[in-house]
């Protein structure tokens, strides 16, 4: 019944969206256990550690909306993925690529390319919508998104789901609509007690989006307004254009935003 309350998503031409599920014990185990292993699964022998924000440096919560800038190099590596920046501040003194987080290899891959604690879902459809000005967007404060393995697409619900400190509308694509909603009198309601801190919410995941676009001369829309690109998220949001870092919201932090004009 909950799935009756969905809206149609769009698939922008030339855009590839992928989702990645990460874990340290088992894929369906609780993320926020009191003492999660910091050296198993996706964390094994890695500098970046999935945890509850209690780590050091970029593995620790910044304490608010302030990102941990300078966490990755200013250009993508030769494989097209970020590298952790080598610096005394980061405590990284050697090449530390993040390919393993965002490539197609996962726990089902054979041989040395296998990545423990990860399942990759590539070319996922249906996440985006189009606003009145022709911009493609996804906004978790308007629509809860849930990955559907049967279609390799996203179910977009007509209501935001999961609250954090009183604000409704979080992005947890590996939770189902029935995990976060109840239905009553033909409408969805947020399920009581399901918050961003709940143990039954899948916190450890990644998403990537690559797109080919042309920026028109003068940088204006058909309405003669500046073309802008806006991003908002918590925990490690990086934006690269032509392999160059142009937006840096790295680190474990509350939701922060950036705008590129």
Task: Go through each PLM region and give its residues.
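Acidic/polar, compositionally biased interaction segments
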Residues: 1-261
């Amino acid at each position: 019944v909950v799935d009756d309350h969905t809206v149609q998503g769009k698939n922008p031409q030339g855009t590839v969206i992928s989702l990645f599920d990460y874990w340290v014990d088992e894929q369906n185990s609780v993320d926020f256990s009191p003492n999660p292993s910091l050296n198993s699964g996706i964390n094994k022998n890695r500098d970046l550690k999935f945890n509850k924000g209690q780590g050091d440096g970029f593995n620790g919560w910044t304490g608010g909306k302030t990102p941990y800038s300078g966490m990755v190099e200013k250009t993508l590596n030769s494989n097209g993925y970020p590298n952790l920046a080598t610096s005394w501040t980061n405590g990284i003194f050697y090449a530390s690529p993040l390919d393993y987080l965002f490539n197609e290899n996962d726990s089902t891959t054979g041989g040395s390319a296998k990545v423990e604690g990860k399942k990759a879902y590539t070319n996922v459809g249906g996440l985006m919508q189009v606003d009145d000005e022709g911009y493609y967007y996804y906004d978790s404060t308007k629509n809860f998104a849930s990955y559907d393995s049967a279609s390799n697409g996203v179910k977009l619900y007509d209501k935001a789901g999961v609250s954090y400190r009183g604000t409704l509308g979080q992005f947890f694509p590996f939770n189902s609509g029935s995990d976060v909603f109840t239905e009553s009198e033909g409408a969805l309601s947020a399920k009581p007690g399901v918050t961003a801190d709940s143990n039954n919410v899948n916190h450890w995941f990644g998403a990537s989006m690559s797109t080919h676009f042309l920026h028109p001369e003068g940088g204006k829309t058909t309405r003669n307004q500046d073309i802008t690109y806006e991003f908002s998220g918590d925990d490690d949001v990086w934006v690269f254009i032509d392999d160059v870092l142009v937006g840096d919201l790295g680190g474990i932090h509350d939701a922060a935003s950036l705008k590129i004009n």
